């Protein structure tokens, strides 16, 4: 077990040296490291959700990104107490997107989405003091607690890792999931393929990957454009084949039937 978070280290814990230079033992070091990992994951997935919220805010009837599931948008708006009657769907999209973006840095209160959890689960979170607050606050708090000279109690560090994880799962990641459906359509059962054999030797092969479906959706959209297909043929290909790997592969597979490489 090794701690590398300050310039006086690294400190390696051994039977002869059970504590680091700051006095932290193996349990505290593992707790710090685990919390840092959790903060990194929460920041990554939540930032994906933030990008989707910004994309929803930029949606327009004549723009590249449109609202493809207005019914789901209206359901979410009502869930959040937003008036929907008589509103243009894009005005509503922008209002809901702004509220979602405020979930990342609001100074008071807890995440809106946690109200979806079963009541008894919410009571457990409240009792244990891990109901997630603003998404970015949980990440910031995690990095604060796991920095040199700060928390060394493993119980407190692991407790905050729970809170940061919930802030992601019931905050940033849920924003990404729900508003991706609003923008790109809610998935339905669909047939597709999975294998490296989905690539076509005579075609231009484009493999989409990553977390955020905003770019991959546009790639899929324009791969079917006659102008793009003509361009591919002008350089000797027979067409364009899109396939996917990683999380984005699932996004385009379940909405468009794009095969997984």
Q: Model segments located where?
A:
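Metallocofactor- and cofactor-centric catalytic cores in central/energy metabolism, strongly enriched
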Residues: 1-261
């Amino acid at each position: 077990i090794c701690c590398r978070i300050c310039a006086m280290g690294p400190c390696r814990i051994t039977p002869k040296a059970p504590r680091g230079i700051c006095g932290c033992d193996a349990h505290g070091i593992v707790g710090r490291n685990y919390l840092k990992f959790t903060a990194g994951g929460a920041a990554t997935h939540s930032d994906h959700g933030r990008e989707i919220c910004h994309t929803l805010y930029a949606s327009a009837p004549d723009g590249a990104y449109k609202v493809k599931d207005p019914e789901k948008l209206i359901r979410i708006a009502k869930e959040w107490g937003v008036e929907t009657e008589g509103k243009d769907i894009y005005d509503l999209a922008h209002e809901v997107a702004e509220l979602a973006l405020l979930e990342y840095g609001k100074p008071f209160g807890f995440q809106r989405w946690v109200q979806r959890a079963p009541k008894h689960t919410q009571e457990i979170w409240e009792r244990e003091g891990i109901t997630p607050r603003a998404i970015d606050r949980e990440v910031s708090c995690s990095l604060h607690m796991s920095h040199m000279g700060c928390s060394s109690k493993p119980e407190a560090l692991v407790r905050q890792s729970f809170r940061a994880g919930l802030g992601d799962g019931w905050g940033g990641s849920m924003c990404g999931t729900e508003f991706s459906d609003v923008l790109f359509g809610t998935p339905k059962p669909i047939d597709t393929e999975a294998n490296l054999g989905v690539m076509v030797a005579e075609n231009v092969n484009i493999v989409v990957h990553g977390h955020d479906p905003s770019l991959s959706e546009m790639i899929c959209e324009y791969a079917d454009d006659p102008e793009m297909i003509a361009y591919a043929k002008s350089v000797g290909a027979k067409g364009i084949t899109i396939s996917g790997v990683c999380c984005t592969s699932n996004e385009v597979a379940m909405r468009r039937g794009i095969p997984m490489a």
